[in-house]
Amino acid sequence: MEPSWLQELMAHPFLLLILLCMSLLLFQVIRLYQRRRWTIRAMHLFPAPPAHWFYGHKESYPVKEFEVYPELMEKYPCAVPLWVGPFTMFFNIHDPDYVKILLKRQDPKSAVSHKILESWVGRGLVTLDGSKWKKHRQIVKPGFNISILKIFITMMSKSVRMMLNKWEEHIAQNSRLELFQHVSLMTLDSIMKCAFSHQGSIQLDSTLDSYLKAVFNLSKISNQRMNNFLHHNDLVFKFSSQGQIFSKFNQELHQFTEKVIQDRKESLKDKLKQDTTQKRRQDFLDILLSAKSENTKDFSEADLQAEVKTFMFAGHDTTTTAISWIFYCLAKYPEHQQRC
């Protein structure tokens, strides 16, 4: 009796392994193809510029995004779907009413963008969802009590006044002023004083220059990675030149946040410093450390690191962008500036 094809295959493990790999590859291709078809059907009502079947809109997006976006917004005033590679599509919304509708929905967070952000910020409030997000939100909630926030106003106003004084000195020598870096220092100065009880002023010294440089480069590389579909794969990105640079700055960011946490832990061990800490109000970091000591199961060291990174980065970067954008709009539309 001749052996069956299955018996022959079992007798050659290498061929069996090849068959298994090919089957898994075929399954993945079919899954991605079905996802592409579903996305096309879901977005068919929204007009979009022609896209290459493999590269998507890579020819014009995002290399020249500041040149392309105004044109896209004029041509597609409500929203436009843009493909990044053959299987990933980003839905760019331009109309505020569309944004309202989207924010009212309970859709899951973007898998691609949050995976990339999570690779250096960690699993904090920005990237979490579900029950763990609710637990973390409950932990940090006391730090946003209105009575505590009122105390911060004085600290923030001092940081703003310091920035304005620097502007007056600069304008006396040069009529042009690049705002973003100054605003970034001011917001980080405010957050470090209010949330982490940082002594001194970041705007006057260069103690956090390495942190700011790391955040800037990590944000830049993350944005570039998001728009390169090949780099969506962790393994491909890790061994790319950008991945190596990303790893270097990510390590610097981790070391900085780790130092902030360890310094506070050491101060709590020191009896004299502990008395000083207890006399002042509890800040954001105190609340996180307290939560970790009370419940190590639901709030680990990694969770602590993630929330510190999230609050430092998301807190100062988003605020900086918003304030800079407001300044730009006020300068572009002086009639509204007069009304303010």
From Swiss-Prot:
The keyword Transmembrane helix applies. Its cofactor is heme. InterPro entries: Cyt_P450 (IPR001128), Cyt_P450_sf (IPR036396), Cytochrome_P450_Monoox (IPR050196). Residues 1-9 are cytoplasmic. Keywords: Membrane, Signal-anchor, Transmembrane, Transmembrane helix. It is found in: Membrane. The chain crosses the membrane at residues 10-30. The keyword Ion transport does not apply. It is a single-pass type II membrane protein. GO terms for cellular component: membrane. Coiled coil: none annotated. One of its GO terms (molecular function) is monooxygenase activity. It holds the Pfam family p450. Residues 31-340 are lumenal. Detected at low levels in mammary gland and mammary carcinoma. Belongs to the cytochrome P450 family. PANTHER family: CYTOCHROME P450 4X1-RELATED, CYTOCHROME P450 FAMILY 4. This is Putative inactive cytochrome P450 family member 4Z2. It comes from Homo sapiens (Human). The gene is CYP4Z2P.
